[in-house]
């Protein structure tokens, strides 16, 4: 659609007039028609904020180019306009033989189809213990033989009611290892939390690496899908790291998903999409302040003043923090990136720490310039200087911050 690029943006109205874009009412999202699929759901147009001096469209396209540099899969983005409003177009993250399941849908389905069943099993198990006036496995073994048999029959029935897949059913008392089953039911207490899908400041409490991973494993089990464990975990942590590097603070559970291959039943993490909340380019005041602070730091020579200006810039940059956390308590406590980085470094294997270091090593002034050149070459339009400066400041700040924390972990000194 290069023939309808105007002022750096794909002109959607011109593309429609020339027959390059077709869409129908079913593909439209929202009453204002500011978000719609076109060309048989292969591309989407999305209007960005037009009321403030923000640059969400550049956040999307810079993150797309950055993801390529870091070898992280991401949806393709380009600048676009529709009805005089600026926006972006993005290619679908799925092919014809694939299905996208958003994180919210996945987490809720796992909760309803698995966690609730296990919670019900535990409550029923406690009632069964009361019925037989026992509390422990040892007390069970002291029951009269007939009571032990009836207890096992009832427990087998309760367990089967909690199973999603028929192949997990216990069909005969001879199949029961009562010690294992008794302890399994006992240990369900607190294992599947009631607040798994509760919201905290708009974020589902399970929107964290640990719970996402657990939910995907369970989803595969109850749905019969196949999971490449290492590949999925790598992609999941790459998403988390990408958000830390870019200050992506809007990775709620509708802004990530899984892709199911209908032919092979293999599940993978969807390519990254919707990065309009990255690089602070959606925050008007932050854009102005980061740009101003960075310019003042270049000319200020007085140490006390430099320290004060840097502290203000640091506070502004760190105001945004990752939507995806590591553990549920990180979500509930609304922990910011410094704590998340510390936990990630502490709890990650050496392999994942090295992977983090490799990605950080690619964030250089030269590579950032290369990203800007790639975008300007594609759009035939200069990127606003303020966008370049703010994006560069955030990327380099986060790179240096994470590297410093890695150095401390290894017993070295900060930069």
For every predicted segment, state its role:
Residues 3-146, 150-189, 193-194:
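Conserved ATP-binding subdomain of kinase catalytic cores across diverse folds
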Residues 38, 198, 261:
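Acidic surface patches and DE-rich sequence motifs
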Residues 38, 45, 77, 90, ...:
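Generic structural hydrophobic/aromatic packing signal, biased to beta-strands
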Residues 55, 60, 68, 142, ...:
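Conserved kinase catalytic-core segment
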Residues 77-84, 252-262, 408-412:
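Short alpha-helical "patches" and their helix-cap loops
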Residues 125, 129, 133-145, 151, ...:
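C-terminal catalytic region of ATP-dependent kinase domains
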Residues 159, 173-226:
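A short mid-domain helix/strand-loop element embedded in enzyme catalytic domains
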């Amino acid at each position: 659609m290069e023939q309808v690029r105007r002022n750096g943006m794909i002109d959607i109205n011109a593309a429609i007039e020339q027959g390059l874009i077709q869409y129908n009412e079913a593909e439209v999202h929202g009453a204002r028609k500011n978000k719609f699929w076109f060309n048989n759901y292969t591309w989407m147009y999305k209007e960005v904020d037009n009321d403030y001096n923000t640059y969400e469209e550049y956040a999307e396209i810079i993150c797309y180019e950055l993801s390529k540099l870091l070898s992280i899969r991401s949806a393709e983005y380009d600048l676009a306009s529709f009805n005089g409003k600026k926006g972006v177009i993005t290619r679908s993250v799925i092919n014809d033989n694939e299905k996208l399941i958003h994180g919210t849908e996945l987490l809720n389905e796992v909760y309803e189809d698995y966690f609730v069943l296990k919670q019900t099993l535990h409550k029923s198990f406690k009632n069964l213990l009361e019925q037989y006036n026992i509390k422990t496995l040892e007390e069970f073994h002291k029951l009269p033989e007939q009571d032990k048999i009836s207890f096992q029959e009832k427990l087998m029935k309760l367990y089967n009611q909690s199973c999603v897949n028929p192949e997990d059913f216990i069909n005969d008392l001879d199949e029961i290892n009562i010690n294992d089953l008794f302890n399994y039911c006992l240990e369900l207490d607190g294992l599947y939390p009631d607040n798994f899908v509760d919201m905290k400041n708009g974020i589902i409490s399970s929107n964290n690496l640990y719970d996402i991973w657990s939910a995907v494993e369970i989803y595969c089990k109850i749905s019969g899908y196949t999971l490449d464990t290492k590949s999925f975990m790598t992609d999941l942590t790459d998403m988390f790291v990408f958000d830390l590097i870019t200050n992506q603070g809007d990775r709620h559970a509708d802004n990530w998903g899984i892709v199911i291959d209908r032919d092979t039943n293999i599940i993978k993490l969807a390519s990254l999409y919707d990065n309009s909340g990255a690089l602070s380019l959606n925050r008007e005041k932050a854009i102005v302040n980061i740009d101003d602070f960075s310019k003042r730091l270049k000319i200020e020579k007085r140490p006390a003043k430099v320290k004060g200006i840097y502290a203000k810039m640091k506070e502004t940059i760190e105001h945004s923090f990752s939507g995806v956390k590591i553990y549920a308590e990180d979500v509930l406590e609304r922990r910011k990136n410094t704590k998340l980085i510390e936990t990630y470094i502490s709890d990650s294997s050496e392999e994942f720490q090295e992977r983090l270091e490799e990605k950080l090593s690619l964030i250089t002034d030269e590579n950032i310039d290369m990203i800007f050149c790639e975008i300007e070459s594609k759009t035939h339009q200069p990127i606003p200087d303020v966008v370049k400066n703010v994006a560069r400041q955030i990327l380099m700040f986060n790179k240096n911050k994470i590297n410093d924390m890695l150095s401390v972990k290894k017993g070295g000194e900060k930069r």
